[in-house]
Amino acid sequence: MSSDPRFDFFQQKKLGIVLAPFSGGQPKSGVENGPKYLMKQGLRSDIESLGWETTLEEPLKGRDFESGKNDETDVYGIMKRPNLVGEATKLIYESVKKVSNEGRLAVTLGGDHSIAIGTVAGVLDKYPNAGLLWIDAHADINTCSTTESGNIHGCPVSFLMGLDAKNTPPSLKWVPKCLDPKKIAYIGLRDVDAAERKILKDNGIASYSMYHVDRYGLNKVIEMALEKVAPNGDEPIMVSYDVDAIDPLYVPATGTPVRGGLTLREGLFLVERIAETGRLVALDVVECNPELASHDGHVVDTITTGCSIARCALGETLL
């Protein structure tokens, strides 16, 4: 491996790996094992081989969040497990905030995408002008009033923006209204609810679906997204990457796969381009679910891809 890209916001290449083995934002088991599989694949040593000094943060260690998924009283209206999600994401928030404020790049391994409530809020505490690239097949911007499933992994962006605040569960009222709609751009969308489409349009949020990738090419889409969330060209960048942005042909072991996604090469090129900006300050890799694989090869494909996303974002280059 070689590592050439610069990282302008860090005097030294120091990085905190935050493990977030949490599945309470959705009903399927197994996604809580994503971090363990990524680490077993050698991700930490891979990152260190790129010149990063790493520390390991485990904010959920010692807490039994999995048994809490069976608590049928943990509801608020249609919202499922808000107390569980609120507790877990607050711990993740404190951990990511600590890593960021110590001058380290935060790499958080999930876990379902509800953990981004904590990661994004933690990063924006340190870098309030950061632009957020949300790489996902889904918009994850349903509110407490629009969600049909009640699964909070489909709602993290709305909590971060403070949308529908009057209906926010008490356990999630700690979440700061920290995300400006002008500071987020989506790439890879292909499964968006009707209510979400309205939210995106009403808030003027930059949203690039697979149609835009096909029409303009991925490199142009990345450039357009960066111009939206970081118009000055020097702002920090955070990437929250749901592996289902990549087509299930390459990433089969994930909770809500949607055909017609990014190719594996496109999925890696995306973060390679972000690394080239020199402005990456945080990365999430979420929704790897080994239990949803139909055979061992699917586990290997998915976990290997998750590790590759992290390495490419952190500066791995071929030449």
UniProtKB/Swiss-Prot annotation:
Catalytic activity as recorded in UniProt: L-arginine + H2O = urea + L-ornithine
Residues given in the record as substrate binding sites: 138-142, 149-151, 193, 256, 287
One Pfam family cited in the UniProt record for this chain: Arginase
Domain of life: Eukaryota
EC number: 3.5.3.1
GO biological process, alphabetically ordered: arginine catabolic process to ornithine; urea cycle
Positions of Mn(2+) 1 binding: 113, 136, 140, 242
Major enzyme class: hydrolase
Keyword Signal listed: no
Record-level Gene Ontology MF annotations: arginase activity; manganese ion binding
KW Ribosomal protein (keyword) present: no
Listed pathway(s): Nitrogen metabolism; urea cycle; L-ornithine and urea from L-arginine: step 1/1
PROSITE patterns assigned to the protein according to its UniProt record, in alphabetical order: ARGINASE_1 (PS01053), ARGINASE_2 (PS51409)
Ligand binding (Mn(2+) 2): 136, 138, 242, 244
Keywords annotated in UniProt: Arginine metabolism, Hydrolase, Manganese, Metal-binding
GO cellular component: cytosol; nucleus
Cofactor field: Mn(2+)
Record's cofactor remark: Binds 2 manganese ions per subunit.
Protein family: Belongs to the arginase family.
Subunit structure: Homotrimer.
Family matches, as NCBIfam families: rocF_arginase
Family annotation (PANTHER family): ARGINASE (PTHR43782:SF3)
Protein's name according to its UniProt entry: Arginase
Organism, scientific name: Kluyveromyces lactis (strain ATCC 8585 / CBS 2359 / DSM 70799 / NBRC 1267 / NRRL Y-1140 / WM37)
Gene name of this polypeptide: CAR1
